[in-house]
UniProtKB/Swiss-Prot annotation:
Region (Disordered): 600-640
Record's compositionally biased regions (Gly residues): 603-614
Protein name according to UniProt: Chaperone protein DnaK
Pfam family for this entry, one: HSP70
UniProt similarity note: Belongs to the heat shock protein 70 family.
Amino acid sequence: MSKVIGIDLGTTNSCVAIMEGTQAKVIENAEGARTTPSMVAFTQGGERLVGQPAKRQAVTNPENTFFAIKRLIGRRYDDPLTQKDKGLVPYRIVGGKNGDAWVESHGKQYSPSEISAFILQKMKETAENYLGEKVTQAVITVPAYFNDSQRQATKDAGKIAGLEVLRIINEPTAAALAYGMEKKGTGTIAVYDLGGGTFDISVLEIGDGVFEVKSTNGDTFLGGEDFDAKIIDYLAEEFQKEQGIDLRKDRLALQRLKEAAEKAKIELSASMQTEVNLPFITADASGPKHLNIKLTRSKLEALVDDLVRRTIEPCKAALKDAGLKASEIDEVILVGGMTRMPKIIETVKQFFGREPHRGVNPDEVVAVGAAIQGGVLKGEVKDVLLLDVTPLSLGIETLGGVFTRLIDRNTTIPTKKSQVFSTAEDNQTAVTIRVFQGEREMAADNKMLGQFDLMGIPSAPRGVPQIEVTFDIDANGIVNVSAKDKATGKEQTIRIQASGGLSDADIDRMVKDAEAHAAEDKKRRELVEARNQADGLIHTTERTLSENGDKLPGAEKSAAEAAIAELRTAMAADDVADIKAKTDALAQASMKLGEALYKAGQETGGPGAPGGDSGASEAGGEKVVDADFEEVDDDRKKSA
């Protein structure tokens, strides 16, 4: 039975884990790290880089290096948050053909699902290299406050990456699962999850293997990226005051600022002051300019105070929905890299009135929980029941543009709910069902998930036809909606896609593209390996020629030199087969050199040759072996 992997597809970093027996294990990637930067880059030569290699070249290739792509997944291009993001990143965000936010590199457009799929492929390969077998199934985590469009887009990313996504699981729920499996206790816990791009708060009851989510809340555009942006603005403004140059207008400088801001933020979790030092950050007519600014922890805390306070309102809402007071929470679990910040820890402590639990690794606990859920689905982990909730209310638009809820937020999923509606006009033969998700009273103020038409309704006065609308939310939190005319039995069903999201044809094309990229990556690896092998053979052959040139016949020597020249020419091109053929030819020429040397050794009776001296010599009764020591016979000892 093949393994199910658990993947935490994070905004900043991603992580993969598997179940080994009763324990979850986080797998190290090819670079030896337990987390992988959620970054994808395309080089000038068309090569695709994922993870650490992409991060390493970001400063010199900012326009084609994609990070924090999770913040765009399932979002419309005209969404105000998308427009805000455009000013924060050095890469191009464009409107896709379906109206969603896409990104562009070297003239080619990619959906956020496709970029995410490249990261998922990297996690899949990491697991396959460790297990030594193919992996086809996964549990992938998403922020609890992700809407249906974002969940569907994440599931699409899994499909593009060649994975069957068995379950989409909420990140705080996964963290609670990992915590609960270790603690084996009972009680009410709150999971405060502040990551690179999103914030979630979930309240759960744990007991006897049952993990029941009571409520969840959050902000899908609040995380470490926003904290970094505050530092970037501060550094840029200080530099502008001093030098009169706005670094944010220079994409290369902006990328260097971003890396420096992230580093400073991390350092200030452990120390009270740090220095941001960026030599040659820009230049003007007077020459190069250097940035050197001291940043204290207190200054950082002042800069991000509004962001920290923004996490409190969702906490209040989650407690209210769960019908609990802060004092009734038994344990607060901190998840996400941002929770290492002392200001966050202090804020959580003040709000909940207790010291938060910091015994879990905030970067890995979500992937561990996903692996455990994979074990539950495969039957490897027994006596665990996970009851999650839908984060946002679902409903349809009714007369006057009112949002009529069919399923309230924090309803346990999977769930199904039906309600009967009627026509608004006399002799109306068709109705358009518009599906929305959100908490506002008017439909237009909420997120539209999609729409469909129910046709062929018999003519009748308004209010007479009976149209039954059914909402069905599966365990992944993904919505299916159907509408049925009770008189005729006619039914129309849709699986809600990200409004204008990826069609099946889009996904199939992207799957093929991803497979092609994987094939290209394999070819590139083969090319590098072939060049390395050729380079090694050239080196050893040239050494043989330089050390033994005087002992080699001219013909063999010339043949080897010609083979080296031909191989060097082949190495300059990208034809793997040609490089291998020329490498084989040089190997043959090199073998002939070896034979010629062996023959020359025989003819001269050289050391080690049959019939030649083995390296020992006798002279004057004195026997010397390999010049290491001397044996003197007894007669000579006496005469001495």
